[in-house]
Amino acid sequence: MLVVLSGGGTAGHINPALALAEVLEERGVEVRFAGTPRGVESRLVPEAGIAFQPFEASGFNRKHPLSLVKALKLISHSTKEAKRWFSEIEPSAVVGFGGYVSIPVARAAEQMGIPVVVHEQN
């Protein structure tokens, strides 16, 4: 069984994901992690010995409508990329821990019929 965890931006999203990863691995479940290439997860996840897959994602500023266009384009692009990745690794489930990167990853899983769990602790 393989489970993909996803989250990004702050340690508040990453630390709970790493705790779940530890428990899953103790039970023999393979874990992969989807995050942003510039967030704290890009350092913490590999340091924990978990395979890391980067996806682009960003928030938007309501005062600057073009930032919404950029964010939506990134969601669309990263959703397609996540679907390609899922086709290769065939995860049994996806768990989203928050952060903008969780949107395209969960969306791709839902579109492919992969069970999605959302754990937003804050």
Language model features with spans:
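Glycosyltransferases and closely related glycan-assembly transferases
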Residues: 81-94, 102-117
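Short beta->alpha connector loops at strand-helix junctions that form conserved
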Residues: 54-58, 97-98, 118-122
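Active-site-proximal region of nucleotide-activated glycan assembly enzymes
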Residues: 30, 40, 51, 111-122
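Conserved nucleotide-sugar phosphate-binding/catalytic loop shared by glycosyltransferases and other
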Residues: 2-7, 26-84
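Short amphipathic alpha-helix
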Residues: 13-24
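Structural detector of well-ordered beta-strand residues that form the stable sheet scaffold
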Residues: 4, 32, 94-95, 117
